[in-house]
Amino acid sequence: MEKLLLIGINTRSMLNSALKLDYDVFSTSYFSTSDTPKIENQIIILEEKDDESSGIFEDKFNSKEILEKSKDYIDEADYIIPISGISPNDFSRKDQKKILGNKDVSKIEDKFRFYKEIEDEFNAPETFLINDVDEAIEISKNKPNVKYIIKPIKGSGGYDINLLNNDSSIQLNNGEKFMLQEYVEGINLSSSILGSRDYKKTIMNSRLLTENDFKSNNSFIYIGNILPLTDESILTKVKDIAKINEEMIETSENLAYKFDLIGSNGVDYIYNKKGLYVIEVNPRIQGTFECVEKSLQTNMLDAHIKSCQNENVEIPKAKYYAYKKIIYSPCRNKYSKINLDNIYDLPHIGTITEKSEPLLTIIDKDSDFKKLYEKVENSSRIVNMEAKIHQQDAI
């Protein structure tokens, strides 16, 4: 039996799909969720213990540590699927040959380089490479009517993105490169693409959700997705949803051909009255993975693998709406069992999650959008209430 290694920040959802396929599955995951399937060949980086804090993800996560601890698995595996947190470019040339997916993503993961690649062909926000905040402020003074954000040229999940203003006290991390980008206000959207050597096709469009959608606090941290994209799921009145979907499908496929994307990939957009803006490409299995599986009732890991092996994959039509919402802890709290059937990525009971760290994920499906939205939002209220009941004093 061929050996398949899943490696990244959280392998739970992919592991569930992989175990339905004919592989000897290996897994290295940073997070240790209590609902992650237990398998023989498994490494968990984050040790969760009773009455102990799981810490701050940004401070503790280190992709090099994951790769170092996975050396034996990497050597033994026939195939490797890196997910969020691990770049294909982190692997040696020899090990890159084992990757099911894109092997060289340097033109995409470097967001400034990506912008330079697409600026003449696609609608994208104006972007500048900067050395410091003062330089960003000087550039912005030339266009006083334009808002700008500062973001790292590498990274995902909406972390370390800040809205610039002239009295900004933004601190840039030493040793990290940043860029200044025109801030496009509008509706966050995304496409899921499936590509092989011979074809590229958009399989689903979705409403992308950030913290700003719920709190209007200029936070760009990823919260989740709702799909498929319809007049209801876009959560805003728009003139022609069919036209938006068509433009997203065409643009996503053009990007997939331009960068020769294979397997499952994603494209993030912002849509407003001026049109559709390309924000970034995610050249790996993306956060919509589980929602797409629930909506289509199909194994998307199987589809990803077959596409990477240049097999034709028939994608069914959406059968359900699906909604994913990550709950970030409203306070420092000690996790206690919550009796809901639509919560995933659960902490171990008795462990402590710090304020604003990911607590768990709500994922559900329904053929009726309003019922689905009410179910997820009701679960969200319950989870936040339970977290506050079990609040812990700050250290």
Where are these regions (language model features)?
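ATP-binding N-terminal substructure of ATP-dependent carboxylate-amine bond-forming enzymes
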Residues: 1-109, 134, 377-378, 384, ...
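ATP-grasp fold ATP-binding core
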Residues: 118, 140-163, 176-191, 203-207, ...
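ATP-dependent carboxylate/phosphate-activation module, predominantly the ATP-grasp catalytic core
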Residues: 185-189, 193-260, 282-306, 317
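A conserved helix-loop-beta module that forms one wall/lid of the active-site cleft
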Residues: 97-165
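Peripheral (often C-terminal) accessory segments that flank ATP-dependent C-N-forming ligase machineries
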Residues: 302-395
